[in-house]
């Protein structure tokens, strides 16, 4: 028996859909996000539901059509599930009008709309104790209704020769075998349903180009799918596959294959048959080995095997000479093969959070890379001159490794770099002149190292915008810091600083100054010149008084002076018209607050815990900060203002 033979043709009137559904099918439907797969405007590039970009350097991938626009990420560590909830509803049936919010009443009304009022059956509602909302006694039947609507949609698809059918997000549990009659289909979107298996008849769709099955409950695929030999894009993300279904290896026309977020443990040698693949995503599975077959995929431009359990890569990876994006982050890699140097088209290489202790010198051949990120490994040094050879780099991230010194290669290695992150290493010195060619360097993170001093040429870092030197052993800031006049963020917390130079007042663009947990006793009067300052953190020092000039910080919203030795607050604090948060808790010598504090009309939070405020009645203090402010206002000479 021929599975693909057509059944009786239903009349058009019995299969008509809503006008909205028809418009969406004829016009291409509403645009979908990458996870869902719905497309828009008839454009196949955005309709295949498979435009997933890999994020080599940050969190999970963002589904966009332009891979290069989001690949470098930088956010979180883990790969987040692709968000498909923003996709507009584009179901190809009229089920949305009857199954979305109308289960109880709509089905009843369809059969009774023409009855006279006295003969219509009553719909009884019951109020449950836990809810004030009346609930119909009729049971919801959304899946049943959805499956019925699928049958209608398939009939219409057959009768009208529709080429693109979107049944996504329709609570479908079963695909009817009548799908075989939709032989004109080139695009079929079934993502975000409850499908556990596909019918054998799916193989009758011999013209199919795009098939989106992501976000279902599939554990296998029927062998008949091999007859869809024109299939180019197959999306199986977020299913329950324990292996790559063998039939996939026979789909020789595939160019894009998404298998992210399944339960796959092995990749068969038959993978070598998919020679037309340009994009392969195996992200977030349980794969421990990637065999030599990967080397046969010479047309690959994007390979994502991040968030697996790989310990090694085959040398054959060097045969994939067209690769521009290779994401290996969050595996258990112990080494990288020398053949990676053959990948001269490589722009993005994700190596974050593995178990590497070194990288091969051959990486210097990958001159197209614009970002180098090996965060979260155990690397102690880089091959001599490697960074200098990669002269297209703009971002270098070596954080959370075992570096004890800056990479060798001199100033040339940072010529075009604007962002350097060496956080959480064991570096005790920034070499003099190391940034002499880094004219574009705007962000340097040296947090959690072993620095005891800053280089004498710090005054040449004139384009620096953000400087993080927290958690080191710095004892002094050089006066030349005054030259960093583009600085907006300066983090110096957890050091051993005893004073701040007067030249700090030259940093007129500073928005954030963090001096928490040092040994500072006095702030310079020039602090009042920082008119753009929004956050000033002085917590856990030895400060006895704030300078009166602090009242000039008109943009200040956050001031923390807790855990110090304050004896009083200056009256000028009442001039901080933008102040929202004030922390003065745990100052054992602070016995009174200035009445002027009540003038801070935008103050939302005041922490005065463990301050012996003898001038304010205990019952007022017990009432909380808002009551304290009211008391100050009522007893101040400004109460009429």
Swiss-Prot record:
Record GO cellular component, one term: cytoplasm
Biased composition (Low complexity): 1-21, 82-100
Annotated segments matching region Disordered: 1-147
Gene3D superfamilies: Ribonuclease Inhibitor
InterPro entries reported in the protein's UniProt record: Leu-rich_rpt, Leu-rich_rpt_typical-subtyp, LRR_dom_sf, LRR_domain-containing, LRR_R13L4/SHOC2-like
Coiled coil regions in record: none
Polar residues bias locations: 101-114
Keywords assigned: Leucine-rich repeat, Repeat
LRR repeats: 161-182, 184-205, 207-228, 230-251, 253-274, 276-297, 299-320, 322-343, 345-367, 368-389, 392-413, 416-437, 440-461, 463-484, 486-507, 509-530, 532-553, 555-576, 578-600, 602-623
UniProt-listed Pfam families: LRR_14, LRR_8
Family, as annotated: Belongs to the SHOC2 family.
Function: Acts as a Ras effector and participates in MAPK pathway activation. Probably acts as a regulatory subunit of protein phosphatase that specifically dephosphorylates Raf kinase and stimulate Raf activity at specialized signaling complexes upon Ras activation.
Protein name in the entry: Leucine-rich repeat protein soc-2 homolog
